[in-house]
C-alpha cells in the first residue's frame, strides 16, 4: 500500500495538496453562519445522488410520469426514502442558499475584491431557484401541471418577445409533452452542469480571496 501511495505522491504531490487544504488560515470571527454555503453544497450533492437514483425508474412522459413516481414511492426498494430525502434536501438547499446570501450581504462579502465571487454566487442562487421550478413539474400531477402552466405563461406579458418566449419554454403553444421533456432535460442535465461550472468558479475564488470580515 505504501508503494502505491509513493507512486501517486511522486507524480501528483498529494501531500502538498493536503497540506495546503488543511493549513488554510481561518479567521477567529468565523462562526456557524459561515458554514451555510458548505451546507448548501452538501444538499446539492445529496440532490445529485438521490436524483440520479430516481432516473432509473422515472419516465418523463405525460402518460407515465405520475405512475412512475407512484411506483418509486410504493414499490421500488427504498424508493420512498430516496424521493423523500430528495424533497427534504431540496427544501433545505433553498433555505440554506437564502440564508447564505443574507449572511454574505450583511458581512460585506460582495465588496472589493470579491465582486466576482458575489456574481457567481447570485448566478448559483438563480440556478437553485430554477431547480425548484423545473423539479416541481416532474411528477406531472395537478399541482405540477398548473404550476408549469402559470410559470411558463408569465413571460407572455412581455411586449413583442413574450409569445415566442412562452412557446420556447413550453415547446409548443400549450403545455404538454414537449414542456415536460424540456423541464426534465433542464432539471437533470442543463442546470446540474451549469451549477457545477459556476461552483468550480465560485469556490477557487473563495479559496484565493479568503473569508470576508465580521459585521
Swiss-Prot record:
* InterPro entries cross-referenced by the UniProt entry: Cyt_b/b6_N, Cyt_B6_PetB, Cytb/b6-like_sf, Cytochrome_b_N_euk/bac, Di-haem_cyt_TM
Molecular function in Gene Ontology: electron transporter, transferring electrons within cytochrome b6/f complex of photosystem II activity; metal ion binding; oxidoreductase activity
Could you list the residue ranges that cross the membrane? 32-52, 90-110, 116-136, 186-206
One GO CC term on file: chloroplast thylakoid membrane
Q: Which domain of life is it from?
A: Eukaryota
The note on cofactor binding and number reads:
Binds 2 heme b groups non-covalently with two histidine residues as axial ligands.
Q: Pfam families, alphabetically?
A: Cytochrome_B
Protein keywords: Chloroplast, Electron transport, Heme, Iron, Membrane, Metal-binding, Photosynthesis, Plastid, Thylakoid, Transmembrane, Transmembrane helix, Transport
GO terms classed as biological process:
photosynthesis; respiratory electron transport chain
Ligand binding (heme c): 35
Residues bound to heme b 2: 86, 187
Q: How does it sit in the membrane?
A: Multi-pass membrane protein
- Cofactor list: heme b; heme c
The places in or outside the cell where this protein is found are: Plastid, Chloroplast thylakoid membrane
Residues at which heme b 1 binds: 100, 202
The protein's matches in CDD domains, at most eight in alphabetical order, are given as: Cytochrome_b_N
Assembly = The 4 large subunits of the cytochrome b6-f complex are cytochrome b6, subunit IV (17 kDa polypeptide, PetD), cytochrome f and the Rieske protein, while the 4 small subunits are PetG, PetL, PetM and PetN. The complex functions as a dimer.
Q: What else is known?
A: Heme 1 (or BH or b566) is high-potential and absorbs at about 566 nm, and heme 2 (or BL or b562) is low-potential and absorbs at about 562 nm.
Q: What exactly does this protein do?
A: Component of the cytochrome b6-f complex, which mediates electron transfer between photosystem II (PSII) and photosystem I (PSI), cyclic electron flow around PSI, and state transitions.
| UniProt record similarity statement | Belongs to the cytochrome b family. PetB subfamily.
Its name, as the record gives it, is Cytochrome b6
Amino acid at each position: 500500500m505504501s508503494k502505491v501511495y509513493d507512486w501517486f505522491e511522486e507524480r501528483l504531490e498529494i501531500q502538498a495538496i493536503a497540506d495546503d487544504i488543511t493549513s488554510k488560515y481561518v479567521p477567529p470571527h468565523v462562526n456557524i453562519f459561515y458554514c451555510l454555503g458548505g451546507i448548501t453544497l452538501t444538499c446539492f450533492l445529496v440532490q445529485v445522488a438521490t436524483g440520479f437514483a430516481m432516473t432509473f425508474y422515472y419516465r418523463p412522459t405525460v402518460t407515465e410520469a405520475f405512475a412512475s413516481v407512484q411506483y418509486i414511492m410504493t414499490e421500488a426498494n427504498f424508493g420512498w426514502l430516496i424521493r423523500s430525502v430528495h424533497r427534504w434536501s431540496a427544501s433545505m438547499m433553498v433555505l440554506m442558499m437564502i440564508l447564505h446570501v443574507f449572511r454574505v450581504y450583511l458581512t460585506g462579502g460582495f465588496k472589493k475584491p470579491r465582486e466576482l465571487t458575489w456574481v457567481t454566487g447570485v448566478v448559483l442562487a438563480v440556478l437553485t431557484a430554477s431547480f425548484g421550478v423545473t423539479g416541481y413539474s416532474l411528477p406531472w400531477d395537478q399541482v405540477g401541471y398548473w404550476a408549469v402552466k402559470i410559470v411558463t405563461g408569465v413571460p407572455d406579458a412581455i411586449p413583442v418577445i413574450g409569445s415566442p418566449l412562452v412557446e420556447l419554454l413550453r415547446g409548443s403553444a400549450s403545455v404538454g409533452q414537449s414542456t415536460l421533456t424540456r423541464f426534465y432535460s433542464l432539471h437533470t442535465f442543463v442546470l446540474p452542469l451549469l451549477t457545477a461550472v459556476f461552483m468550480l468558479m465560485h469556490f477557487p475564488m473563495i479559496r484565493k480571496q479568503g473569508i470576508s470580515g465580521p459585521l
